[in-house]
Amino acid sequence: MNIIENIEKNDFSEIELAAIPFNTLADHYGSALAKEQLALEHESYELGERRFLKMLERQAKAGEIADNAAAKPLLATLLPKLTTRIVEWLEEYASKKGRKPSAYAPLQLLKPEASAFITLKVILASLTSTNMTTIQAAAGMLGKAIEDEARFGRIRDLEAKHFKKHVEEQLNKRHGQVYKKAFMQVVEADMIGRGLLGGEAWSSWDKETTMHVGIRLIEMLIESTGLVELQRHNAGNAGSDHEALQLAQEYVDVLAKRAGALAGISPMFQPCVVPPKPWVAITGGGYWANGRRPLALVRTHSKKGLMRYEDVYMPEVYKAVNLAQNTAWKINKKVLAVVNEIVNWKNCPVADIPSLERQELPPKPDDIDTNEAALKEWKKAAAGIYRLDKARVSRRISLEFMLEQANKFASKKAIWFPYNMDWRGRVYAVPMFNPQGNDMTKGLLTLAKGKPIGEEGFYWLKIHGANCAGVDKVPFPERIAFIEKHVDDILACAKDPINNTWWAEQDSPFCFLAFCFEYAGVTHHGLSYNCSLPLAFDGSCSGIQHFSAMLRDEVGGRAVNLLPSETVQDIYGIVAQKVNEILKQDAINGTPNEMITVTDKDTGEISEKLKLGTSTLAQQWLAYGVTRSVTKRSVMTLAYGSKEFGFRQQVLDDTIQPAIDSGKGLMFTQPNQAAGYMAKLIWDAVSVTVVAAVEAMNWLKSAAKLLAAEVKDKKTKEILRHRCAVHWTTPDGFPVWQEYRKPLQKRLDMIFLGQFRLQPTINTLKDSGIDAHKQESGIAPNFVHSQDGSHLRMTVVYAHEKYGIESFALIHDSFGTIPADAGKLFKAVRETMVITYENNDVLADFYSQFADQLHETQLDKMPPLPKKGNLNLQDILKSDFAFA
């Protein structure tokens, strides 16, 4: 039975024909725009349904329908039934004397729930991709899947440490059963050769055993669930008489009904052609028709989480979100024309545009069939290209969607983007195509309401142009000088961007191209030129800025430009400089390479391994060159909870692996060792640069850890205090609840078939409880994100009420508006930062909100509030580069 064909398409006409929103919109904007807006909202649901069903069809063809949300509840319902039947069958024959069934011994090798899960997944996969299959084919496939799990699962179960350390990550990087299995065969052979797994090779099951296992599981599946049924075909015809398996119609209907329901609540939200519906409650804002899935003001993980906000009085928060989404935008047609022209070029001048075609694989060596070393080297090079190609395809699909949306709305005089918030209070645009996207998306959008640029606006336009070119780490006069030096280049790009592609060489090419067009407009029309290009003022490592301000930390504050300075303080560059100083010392005086002996904990086998000394590692990094780009992500994420181990992975992913893929990282002979060495240097350097921020993060973690701890009486073991979530309120009145809970389900891990969460049985059903580890590790990033979210919202309201600014381009720590109002926003962003931390001691407020929840035995364990420094918050008002 074909599930896709049985899905009944949704009728979304209630959206387009909704009378109340139509009448409201018609009264304000006319019936034509009212009709168009509701048609767009209707279309968003149709597009979402199409996307969902396309994904479902793709998964069905690939045999992966069990991974779709439509099938997961069915699996969760059937899994306990089949598991129980398998347990009963095993127990029945365990107590019987005499010869056991052929399937008995093999099925004892797996946990019953694992056998049940594999059965459901394999049978669903085979029947949704082919409608029906012979029982022999299904049994053979199922029996083989059971054997594979028994065979390779022993690596995970018997050699757990080895699997975690050396196998799991590499296994997860491989996609497709064939590649995963080939990899595990190599791993298995290597482990057996080294005496692991008892030194015994797997004794493969014969075809008869495989068939017995498969048929017995299919029989139990039919007995316990009725998921499949046997149909006899061509009865009496000796040549073609056979029994086939197919999904029972009731389950086809269940899957089709759920898939249809999910498809109906998966809209691909689009921009609006009228101002979004104002937020006045926690649901129902943004889009005018409610639809099947009305927007929520706060993105939470559950309805219960959302309802916490129902009675919260937070007028400033509502005001800010409504101002953000009331900003009118339009498509920048000049930039759009250029993108449409170049995006399909084979040699696109913009390096970041993903190409239409895959990079060619390296030529195979002539002796590849006989030279194992050559084959291995070629495979390694090809693997890098395949990995890059997967990312290319994903980026290309995203690019084409954004471009399609830009072309779709290009004729509109104005469009709007509904906004809402995550649970920490960070403000997000709802449609996929929005002003918070990448450089191309931002370049394709401009504000709809401009003003005569004026002299001050022209000044800020030049600063913006230099920033887009990457000339943003120098004082303003030098940025202006850069623009004035390149006036001819800028005007040439504006006149003929297809043939003059200097703009494509800049740091943010499409935003720079948009600047070129506006600069040419001012040049040709003078200071009365009406300019609507959004100019952005970006924070300087925002997380550290907020920690430094709340702690009055002069050292950290200076490093992130909170204090006035003649030059731009670049914390990423400062850390890179400190790292380079150590590298130069280590290159001369560092430790030498050494061969170290490694003893296998399980087998006692001793082997030798080359450990690079700090001298060699330093020389490798000096040869590569450590700049701010190497340290940037690690320093930036420090305020968001990243530590030395996290730095290591970041360095590996962001610097070393791309360098190796591009051929520029050949010096890194031991990538993991090079990453670990650099991570330690960055950690040490940043820890002495922003001491107060690190102290505040540790203090927050201590608080979250104590709140998440269960307090028991030492003698009676009576629980004196249950684990608590963490709650605080931001300066503008937004309440934040951090409540990570342990999942109720138990996770079932398969070697090849992924993961599944088992619903607990009646006997094991308990409150999941607070996840203490996540509470502790999440508090620092979530707390500082909530503070920058509050600062953004306060800035929007303040800038509107004090300076009359109406248009806002907002991305968390980036504040933008039109050039004529840029000078006002430049002041507003600093003034609200000062107001926030002069009027609020956010750490003390946080402490006061949870102190009474601590048990008396915990009070001594809570460290005192971090000490404050001598930073004068008023100095932020005089800092050119705090947000620049």
From Swiss-Prot:
The active site is at D538, K632, D813. It is an enzyme of class 2 (transferase). The keyword Nucleotidyltransferase applies. It holds the Pfam family RNA_pol. Transmembrane segments: none annotated. The keyword Transcription applies. InterPro entries: DNA-dir_RNA_pol_helix_hairp_sf, DNA-dir_Rpol_C_phage-type, DNA-dir_Rpol_phage-type, DNA/RNA_pol_sf, RNA_POL_N_sf, RPOL_N. GO terms for biological process: DNA-templated transcription; DNA-templated viral transcription. Keywords: DNA-directed RNA polymerase, Nucleotidyltransferase, Transcription, Transferase, Viral transcription. It catalyses: RNA(n) + a ribonucleoside 5'-triphosphate = RNA(n+1) + diphosphate. GO terms for molecular function: DNA binding; DNA-directed RNA polymerase activity. One of its GO terms (cellular component) is DNA-directed RNA polymerase complex. Its EC number is 2.7.7.6. SUPFAM superfamilies: DNA/RNA polymerases (SSF56672). Belongs to the phage and mitochondrial RNA polymerase family. DNA-dependent RNA polymerase catalyzes the transcription of DNA into RNA using the four ribonucleoside triphosphates as substrates. This is DNA-directed RNA polymerase. The lineage of its organism: Viruses, Duplodnaviria, Heunggongvirae, Uroviricota, Caudoviricetes.
